[in-house]
Amino acid sequence: MSDIFEEAASFRSYQSKLGRDGRASAATATLTTKIRIFVPATNSPELRWELTLFALDVIRSPSAAESMKVGAAFTLISMYSERPGALIRSLLNDPDIEAVIIDVGSMVNGIPVMERRGDKAQEEMEGLMRILKTARDSSKGKTPFVDSRAYGLRITDMSTLVSAVITIEAQIWILIAKAVTAPDTAEESETRRWAKYVQQKRVNPFFALTQQWLTEMRNLLSQSLSVRKFMVEILIEVKKGGSAKGRAVEIISDIGNYVEETGMAGFFATIRFGLETRYPALALNEFQSDLNTIKSLMLLYREIGPRAPYMVLLEESIQTKFAPGGYPLLWSFAMGVATTIDRSMGALNINRGYLEPMYFRLGQKSARHHAGGIDQNMANRLGLSSDQVAELAAAVQETSAGRQESNVQAREAKFAAGGVLIGGSDQDIDEGEEPIEQSGRQSVTFKREMSISSLANSVPSSSVSTSGGTRLTNSLLNLRSRLAAKAAKEAASSNATDDPAISNRTQGESEKKNNQDLKPAQNDLDFVRADV
């Protein structure tokens, strides 16, 4: 039987890589689009700045074709290079486009001067002039910059040009991090990163671009795979460089840290919180299939090479194999662990159709019960004695209890999945609290089949105190006191039957109070079940 299990694991690995070997035998070439890319022929600061302004206007012009805007994006992205044309020729390898690189030696009225002469060149220059005119007319006289003085600035020294180009390119590179995964909600994170570079004095806020222009550029990045491919090639290239790098290359490399692995948070969170925590729950038979899948995906990720972190940006078809829907049980368990021990994971949207509530709660419970667990291999490397290990485990348990009491709802990601409330079950709920709603669906608290009173009375105080600590004891005592108060109210209401009006009113108030008391009782029941 061991052979079939080994073959199953090997088959998973083969299935993940199926069809990736060999070369295509059929003619799979696609139609191409011709784009014109204007690059400076010299290092003149004045020429480069005028060409930069021209590219900014083309991208915001409503009359410019998409191919024209793509060419302008290539111009802006490569402007930091000493030889932009050589950079584009060496890195551009896109079967969807045919790049025509045009060296610009001079500018007239803000447009490049064509080297060749004749009616054709004159018509092209007139077309470029119309593109600039519509860009300025559509913006009602506004410039691409927040400070309009930057648009009319005449740059003649190289230091000012470098500062301006780095600032403009930094804003473009910041856009790519969310251009594919969340373009509609990207402004907040982009603003934080821009503020970071301003605070570090790595960019000049005088050359800050308007939000309208950034929106146009973000949309272009979302639509154009060719531009993203070129940017990814630059990211891969700048990582290969040695210790001596220019300012522009350093800031591009820094932004690349945010771009890496974009769109693959579920895969890497599963590895981090599902595997590397090494909780005993991984021994469950239900997880073995997902574990084999994750193992084969990790091997495949390594085989893809340096482009693997950017597979979502590059729209590679292999990216779908890394989606959490391929290993839903292990992912659900990992998300339960993550939302319990990592505060930053509380904001991650894990409300997916393939989320398994039972394994999500199992992850939460494992993270709580195994807080303070010690890795014996690491303890042996550090030379820790048994007393030191015990003290460390006790300290972690103590701090973990305080952390959970402080903000359980935020830490454990209380949210609605499929109309059922998950997580956050071990904190007391105010009697006046309303049921939580999310995405237009009312959350439903799980029904309890076990009697509350029987469960509360069946757990000795001593066992509860030792297993769950003081917090569990107090919660159980509160539960018992509420049950006793409820019984006293029922006895009092049964004696007030002489006056029918009073009896009816008392009965209605009692039912309303009982319903309110039931919510915290159910919540405390979750707490008892989670810790006993």
From Swiss-Prot:
Transmembrane segments: none annotated. The keyword rRNA processing does not apply. Residues 487-497 have a biased composition (Low complexity). Residues 422-444, 487-532 are annotated as: Disordered. One of its GO terms (cellular component) is viral nucleocapsid. It holds the Pfam family Paramyxo_ncap. Residues 403-532 are annotated as: Ntail. The keyword Ribonucleoprotein applies. GO terms for molecular function: molecular adaptor activity; RNA binding; structural molecule activity. Belongs to the paramyxoviruses nucleocapsid family. Homomultimer; forms the nucleocapsid. Binds to the viral genomic RNA. N0 interacts with the phosphoprotein (via N-terminus); this interaction allows P to chaperon N0 to avoid N polymerization before encapsidation. Interacts (via C-terminus) as N-RNA template with the phosphoprotein (via C-terminus); this interaction positions the polymerase on the template. Forms the helical nucleocapsid (NC) in a ratio of 1 N per 6 ribonucleotides, protecting the genome from nucleases. The nucleocapsid (NC) has a helical structure with either 13.4 N per turn, approximately 20 nm in diameter, with a hollow central cavity of 56 nm in diameter. The encapsidated genomic RNA serves as template for transcription and replication; encapsidation by N is coupled to RNA synthesis. Forms the encapsidation complex with the phosphoprotein protein P. Before encapsidation, the newly synthesized free N protein, so-called N0, is chaperoned by P. This is Nucleoprotein. It comes from Nipah virus. The gene is N.
